From Swiss-Prot:
<keyword id="KW-0378">Hydrolase</keyword>
<dbReference type="Pfam" id="PF04029">
    <property type="entry name" value="2-ph_phosp"/>
</dbReference>
<keyword id="KW-0460">Magnesium</keyword>
<comment type="similarity">
    <text>Belongs to the ComB family.</text>
</comment>
<dbReference type="GO" id="GO:0050545">
    <property type="term" value="F:sulfopyruvate decarboxylase activity"/>
</dbReference>
<protein>
    <recommendedName>
        <fullName>Probable 2-phosphosulfolactate phosphatase</fullName>
        <ecNumber>3.1.3.71</ecNumber>
    </recommendedName>
</protein>
<dbReference type="GO" id="GO:0000287">
    <property type="term" value="F:magnesium ion binding"/>
</dbReference>
<dbReference type="InterPro" id="IPR036702">
    <property type="entry name" value="ComB-like_sf"/>
</dbReference>
<dbReference type="InterPro" id="IPR005238">
    <property type="entry name" value="ComB-like"/>
</dbReference>
<dbReference type="GO" id="GO:0050532">
    <property type="term" value="F:2-phosphosulfolactate phosphatase activity"/>
</dbReference>
Amino acid sequence: MKIDVIISADYIDSEALKGKIAVVIDMLRATSVITTALYNGAKKVIPVVSVEEAFEKAKELKSLGEEVLLGGERKALKIDGFDFSNSPLEYKREIVEGKNVIMSTTNGTRALNLCSKADKVIVASVLNGQAVAKYLENEEKEIVFVNSGTNGEFSSDDFMCAGYIISELCKNKEAELTDIAKTAKYVYESSEGIEEFIKDAKHYNILKNLGLEEDLKYCSTKNLIDLVFEFKNGEIKTVESGVKVTI
């Protein structure tokens, strides 16, 4: 198994991902939202790039009698006309269960759609990091951890999340790591904890200044969720893998 890391959505080469497994991370906060919404019973999550596409998709599904919720952000703030912002704490079971969630965010949903040519696209966060690592143990294809980044730039929170999952994966699986994958693993293993390390990150402080400390704490919590989610044919659903994940 070979493991690589892409540092932001701007560095994604969609064609180069063919034949590989992409593990998409937007720790703060899109993939944490997706993980939470599906864990809380959402029927599926549909990630789209633009706000206009989100409204069009919602209209289409509603015409078919489907229940739809819109979630996402621009500049970390809720989009006008959407039901939710990009806070995972808003996606409670009593609200999302059995419903379709359409999401559009600045970084995460863009990264997911750019990875659609990969053989498989897995959605990862700190919340389900160990479950993702356990699932990937059964794969032999090259794995590329895709950090969504922040507005095309490197983001240390996504890098730490990738390092965490790589570290967990390498406990039980021999792997050939690229230099950047080795660095992510080393940075995670040398840190005093994910949230402590990312406190100086630009995006962390944007969210902190908006009063979203509870989001930051939640998104930095390991292994709250023991499920794995796959983006396929434009939709994200729980993987039916038959893999027993013990946490």
